[in-house]
């Protein structure tokens, strides 16, 4: 079992892809007090601590006990996917690369035009693969 590669993948997601793209896209919902966005953020943090617990038990024990009142080290099974109703979430498993590409393209376009990241920008089409995220991406990038 190659624990190094698994740990690096979790680290790459939790310190790079998740905050830089998924969390950035949800930021306005979090600021507005959206309970679903808040729950999802906590669920991801809690599950990430659980995944890291075999590798860094003292760190994950302290954080999970402080935040959630239960040590991630005591968890004996990897967390199950929790969705309400018959929601199909499998489509979200394959769009991270499209999300990263779209965000990078918008950020580069704004930088090349000397605009701040909060500046409005127009004539941008959200790719069809990201249509479920169009509202969040429009808000995130100030697309008019």
What does each model-found stretch correspond to?
Residues 1-144:
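Feature 926 captures the class I aminoacyl-tRNA synthetase adenylation module centered on the KMSKS loop
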């Amino acid at each position: 079992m190659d624990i190094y590669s698994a740990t690096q993948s979790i680290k790459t997601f939790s310190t790079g892809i998740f905050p830089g793209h998924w969390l950035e896209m949800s930021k306005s919902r979090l600021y507005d007090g959206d309970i679903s966005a808040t729950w999802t953020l906590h669920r991801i943090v809690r599950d990430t601590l659980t995944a890291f617990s075999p590798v860094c038990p003292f760190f994950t024990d302290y954080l999970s006990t402080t935040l959630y009142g239960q040590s991630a080290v005591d968890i004996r099974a990897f967390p199950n996917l929790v969705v309400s109703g018959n929601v199909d979430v499998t489509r979200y498993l394959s769009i991270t690369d499209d999300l990263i590409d779209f965000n990078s393209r918008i950020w580069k376009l704004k930088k090349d035009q000397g605009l701040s990241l909060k500046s409005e920008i127009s004539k941008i089409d959200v790719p069809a693969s990201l249509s479920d995220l169009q509202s969040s991406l429009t808000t995130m990038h100030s697309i008019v």
